From Swiss-Prot:
Gene Ontology MF annotations: dynein light intermediate chain binding; identical protein binding; microtubule binding
Chloroplast recorded as keyword: no
Lineage: Eukaryota, Metazoa, Chordata, Craniata, Vertebrata
Recorded superkingdom: Eukaryota
Protein name per Swiss-Prot or TrEMBL: Protein Hook homolog 2
Region (Required for localization to the centrosome and induction of aggresome formation): 1-161, 533-719
Keywords in alphabetical order: Coiled coil, Cytoplasm, Cytoskeleton, Golgi apparatus, Microtubule, Phosphoprotein, Protein transport, Transport
Sites of Phosphothreonine modification: 230
Modified residues (Phosphoserine): 163, 710
Region Sufficient for interaction with CNTRL, annotated ranges: 584-719
Family in the record: Belongs to the hook family.
Limits of the Calponin-homology (CH) domain: 6-122
Coiled-coil intervals, chain numbering: 180-427, 455-607
GO BP of this protein: cytoplasmic microtubule organization; cytoskeleton-dependent intracellular transport; early endosome to late endosome transport; endocytosis; endosome organization; endosome to lysosome transport; lysosome organization; protein localization to perinuclear region of cytoplasm
Amino acid sequence: MSVDKAELCGSLLTWLQTFHVPSPCASPQDLSSGLAVAYVLNQIDPSWFNEAWLQGISEDPGPNWKLKVSNLKMVLRSLVEYSQDVLAHPVSEEHLPDVSLIGEFSDPAELGKLLQLVLGCAISCEKKQDHIQRIMTLEESVQHVVMEAIQELMTKDTPDSLSPETYGNFDSQSRRYYFLSEEAEEGDELQQRCLDLERQLMLLSEEKQSLAQENAGLRERMGRPEGEGTPGLTAKKLLLLQSQLEQLQEENFRLESGREDERLRCAELEREVAELQHRNQALTSLAQEAQALKDEMDELRQSSERAGQLEATLTSCRRRLGELRELRRQVRQLEERNAGHAERTRQLEDELRRAGSLRAQLEAQRRQVQELQGQRQEEAMKAEKWLFECRNLEEKYESVTKEKERLLAERDSLREANEELRCAQLQPRGLTQADPSLDPTSTPVDNLAAEILPAELRETLLRLQLENKRLCRQEAADRERQEELQRHLEDANRARHGLETQHRLNQQQLSELRAQVEDLQKALQEQGGKTEDAISILLKRKLEEHLQKLHEADLELQRKREYIEELEPPTDSSTARRIEELQHNLQKKDADLRAMEERYRRYVDKARMVMQTMEPKQRPAAGAPPELHSLRTQLRERDVRIRHLEMDFEKSRSQREQEEKLLISAWYNMGMALQQRAGEERAPAHAQSFLAQQRLATNSRRGPLGRLASLNLRPTDKH
């Protein structure tokens, strides 16, 4: 019977609101974007519908129906993949909704199909009990519609989900494991079913008794004559009672036939219960035997582990004895080195005492040398100052001499010009008389002749006079500026010369100090004493370094002695006997069934001991630089050994896992064969009714299919 998709959409909307998603989901229009459905799927299975998948859904598509269709396609694709890959429930074509109608028109029928797929994922996931409890809290009408949708989905998915091709590749080991677990569950279900049928039979018998009593009462009433009432009313009552009697007789007959069927069914169920109990006893005995074998294997494994631990302890003790001998040798070397350092320290102290007696004399001589150097530097500065003044005076003298020569040359040129002018004075006399402005000594009466000169000549003469005055003023200003620059140049030269003098004096002083230092060193070497301050500082530094090394050597020696005391093996005779007994037990464990596991444990313990022996040798390596190279070499060798041990461990572990898988698979196959043989022996040889044959065929088909379904729902319980 198909469910109305519109009604289903409304009921599933009510169910969807119980998830409390951030997106609204009260109407089909709210679900047309696909965002609310995506949030619900994220709550159903966060591992599959994770946050990365949720971010791929567009959060606000708005009125754009194409974005809504894109979101719905992504949600539908993920739903189908989840059903096929995780739940192993392939979705048929008739259950796939048309997402374009949902995104564009919010079609309730197509939306109901989509929500029906979401419901199927919810009741088939790992949290299905929580979702079923959530459905039970809804209204009764909503529960009825939801249950019809689940039944429709399961009835249409059962043929596909229970096909042999889907479950043909399961491991026989897991199949046998779940088959054993289903046997006990089927026995409990059949027992509960028998109890329910007995309870129904009791209720039907009580109901039959009550109906018989009521029938007897009605017959008594019919037999009594009624004094009151009309005959028509009596006839009507009689007809009514007869009809009720016929109905009750029919109901009684139906109940009798149903009781007979239930009795037959109960007998068949009792036979099935007896068979299942017999099978349960056989399986219980097999389980007890398997548990006993498992306990024996655990004991053997513990003994092999104990043997490996004892062997590792023995190996570590031997290694520690070798290390103890090596540490004793190192302690002897450190003691010899410590004695050498102590002798060197005493020698340095004697040299320091001899050098202290000459330090005061050296300080007095150094102060005198510094005073003499200061006086010499002052005198040198004065001499340089007078030398610079002398050079300046010489430069001034040279400049004055050059100026004198220039003035003499200018005087000669002026004399020649004056003579030439005197020679030519006779010719322009008339010009001078005509223009009295050219002759400053002429009287105003003589200037009357100047009017005879043309106007252009007079303007030219005036312009030349003004130009001459301007040039004279400019020459005076340039001369003042040149004098000022000359003064600045002299100041700069004086400062530069002073700096050069200071530099030269410093260089000379430095060379003198170096020469003095060399002389003093030579003198001290000749005298055989080391009284210089630098040498005393060097001796102090060397003494401090030797004292520090001596202190470090003492600390190192003390640490190694403590470590030797810790590594010192006990001399108890019982411990020696115990070690011999353990060695004897180790030789007896060579033929154990768990040899590979023992080898694995031994390698792990050896690697741990190597790491533990590396740590105490890394700490004293800081105080013993000569042994650093050997320790590093040992560390590299142990790293290589650890890598080899890890590779061997990986190989042994993989081989051990394969052996366990083969052993368990063979065990389960043997149990399956024994059970099949027992079922064939218990099969009834006499003829059965048609109904019994059909029930046996149904149960035989239901058993493997039910086990396959349980294997499908729980494929990872072993892990």
